[in-house]
Amino acid sequence: HNVDVRFLSRYEGEPGPAQVDALRGEWEAEADGVVLIPVDGTLLAAGLREAPSTLAVAVVGPELKGADVGCYISSDPAEMGRQLADAIIADGQSACTVYLSRGAGEAASQRYQGLVTRLLERRIACEQVTVDPEEDFALPDGRAAVALEPEMTQALCQRSGGTSQVYGVGASNQLLHDLEEGKAAALAVQSDYDAGYLSLLSVIAQLEGERQENRVLESYVATAENMFTDPMDQILFPIG
């Protein structure tokens, strides 16, 4: 396929409104299709309702209520939360504190429900704290520190003091380095390569008039012990 692809990963100003402004700029520039990773699902859904019906749209993330989206591509957020809980249980943790940002989106909320339900089944005490990643806070001793957003996971790793009590979400280069160094005990991940590849194929297929089904990606738990072994290394480092 001969496709002109442009990546826009940073926004000026407040990220939620700025993403909607960037989306509007794309369709006003007569872009044929977009792949979106939602920052603020409610705002983005409202923006998409104004988009021309000819715009092919694929969303990497949870469903946007009321938006006309050709295809959603995402792991199951609740299952990802359960997998993270299983890692906490397997490590013998008896209590945990879950850190959610004030702007936590729908995916983080669903991960939280999956996590807490599984932990309560095993009678593991779970406290929830609302705090933004850039705020000044310290991790409590003797409890697992859990994040359900990549930015918050990074914030916990920065405050971990080298312990292995942080459990989080994401597979950025920095987070994988923190995992290898022992600043994180486990990370719930999906294949970002698959997400990107399938989202582009979906937009192309929509432009060719093909109806697309939503795609559910597998999610996994990466640890320092398995991150360089097959198949986890293929998931985390698909191009190497």
Positions of the model-derived regions?
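Short, solvent-exposed amphipathic alpha-helices that sit
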Residues: 1, 18, 80-84, 106-126, ...
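Short beta-strand elements in bilobed, periplasmic/extracellular small-molecule ligand-binding domains
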Residues: 1-14, 97-100, 116-137, 144
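Hydrophobic alpha-helical
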Residues: 23, 33-53, 115, 129-178
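Short, high-confidence coil segments that cap the C-terminus of an alpha-helix
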Residues: 31, 93-94, 141-143, 184
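Flexible loop/hinge segments that line or gate small-molecule binding clefts
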Residues: 41-79, 172-181, 185
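Hydrophobic alpha-helical segments within soluble ligand-binding/sensing domains
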Residues: 72-97, 171-175, 190-208
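Hinge/cleft segment of the Venus flytrap/periplasmic-binding protein
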Residues: 119, 194-240
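Exported/periplasmic ABC-transporter solute-binding proteins
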Residues: 150, 158-193, 201, 209-218
